[in-house]
């Protein structure tokens, strides 16, 4: 572990210890709390700059849209990727962009926090129960109704998927609203959604067609990841060989490259690269299945509504696994490569 990573780990532990009780003084909501309140202005707080974490917020935004169709939603995010992700969400009114490096942008960082205090909201939702800054910002914001994000015991008893990072905020919101006498909501949870336009889908198809130069459906792989989530070249070489043996006659097999322009299969497959998140999504949306280790691009594929196979070297697929549209998470310390191939076959049936 690098010194920087060690410092960040210690910082998170200290901040979590300091802020874990923030919001504990708020009592359970009751129907009295919503008297004379019409929920029109909502603030969702998710101060994380990573692509995957921002994409994992899209189901919560959809849930708020569906529950309060006429509301305006402000987002408190970190970095600039949220602007691309929520570009086609008409309900988004404003995105507060917290700088990724606060100590290099102290004034902007402070102004973002101060701006939260200046505006009144009807409802504030902390999108990450483990975010210290999220809890502090939720506490700081002006609103009669606040969801801090703690997973209540009754949710844990009722839902076996409550651990998932994009699902529990929705379960929390539904529980909170039921306490306010809103109708009980047991509808299917929203999936990650980039809301690609027809033009973006058409452009993605054109790029894919130019790469493949045939009409066969496409399997796309992404071989990069961070730390111990990243599989070795030997692992990917073996897996790529199995993909070719089982699918090459009927499917194109291509690789999406990361910004580092590296390939764990040594560029043996036709490949493409893009810096544009929405263009990447448009290309992926035209493929039959997307295969990747646990990373932000895996969530991007899921948000493009493409069946996504997430390869997990850690046992945390219940928290981060792709879901919906036939997607699944495979724990590769339990599943063999051949079992992974069979799972892909089942998706493509």
Show which residues each predicted segment covers.
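Short internal beta-strands
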Residues: 73-79, 253-257
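Positively charged, low-complexity intrinsically disordered leader regions
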Residues: 1-39
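Conserved nucleotide-sugar phosphate-binding/catalytic loop shared by glycosyltransferases and other
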Residues: 75-106, 330
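Conserved nucleotide-diphosphate donor binding/catalytic pocket of glycan-assembly enzymes
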Residues: 2-7, 96-193, 215-222, 315-318
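Short amphipathic alpha-helix
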Residues: 54-64, 81, 239
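Donor-binding and catalytic core of enzymes assembling or modifying cell-surface/extracellular glycoconjugates
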Residues: 231-317
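Active-site donor-nucleotide binding/catalytic segment of nucleotide-sugar enzymes
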Residues: 41, 45-47, 191, 195-262, ...
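Nucleotide-sugar donor-binding patch of glycosyltransferase catalytic domains
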Residues: 2-4, 148-149, 271, 299-349
């Amino acid at each position: 572990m690098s010194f920087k990573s060690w410092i960040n780990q210690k910082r998170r532990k200290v901040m979590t210890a300091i802020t874990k009780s923030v919001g504990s003084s708020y009592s359970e909501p009751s129907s009295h709390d919503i008297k004379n309140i019409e929920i029109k202005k909502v603030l969702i707080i998710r101060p994380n700059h990573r692509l995957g974490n921002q994409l994992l917020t899209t189901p919560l935004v959809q849930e708020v849209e569906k529950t309060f169709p006429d509301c305006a939603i402000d987002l408190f995010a970190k970095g600039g990727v949220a602007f691309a992700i929520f570009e086609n969400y008409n309900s988004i009114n404003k995105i507060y962009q917290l700088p990724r490096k606060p100590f290099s942008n102290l004034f902007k960082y402070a102004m973002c926090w101060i701006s939260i205090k200046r505006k009144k909201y009807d409802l504030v939702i902390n999108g990450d129960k483990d975010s210290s800054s999220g809890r502090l910002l939720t506490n700081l914001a002006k609103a009669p109704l606040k969801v801090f994000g703690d997973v209540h015991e009754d949710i844990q008893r009722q839902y076996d998927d409550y651990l998932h990072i994009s699902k529990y905020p929705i379960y929390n919101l539904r529980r909170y609203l039921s306490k306010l006498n809103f109708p009980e909501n047991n509808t299917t949870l929203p999936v990650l959604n980039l809301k690609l336009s027809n033009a973006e889908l058409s452009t993605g198809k054109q790029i894919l067609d130019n790469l493949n130069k045939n009409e066969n459906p496409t399997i796309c792989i992404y071989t990069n990841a961070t730390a111990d989530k990243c599989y070795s070249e030997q692992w990917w070489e073996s897996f790529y060989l199995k993909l070719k043996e089982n699918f090459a006659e009927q499917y194109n097999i291509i690789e999406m490259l990361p910004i580092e322009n590296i390939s764990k299969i040594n560029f043996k497959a036709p490949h493409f690269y893009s810096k544009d998140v929405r263009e990447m999504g448009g290309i992926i949306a035209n493929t039959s299945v997307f295969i990747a280790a646990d990373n932000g691009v895996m969530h991007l594929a899921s948000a493009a509504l493409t069946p996504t196979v997430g390869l997990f070297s850690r046992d945390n697929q219940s928290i981060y696994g792709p879901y919906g549209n036939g997607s699944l998470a495979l724990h590769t310390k339990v599943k063999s490569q051949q079992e992974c191939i069979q799972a892909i076959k089942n998706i493509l049936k």
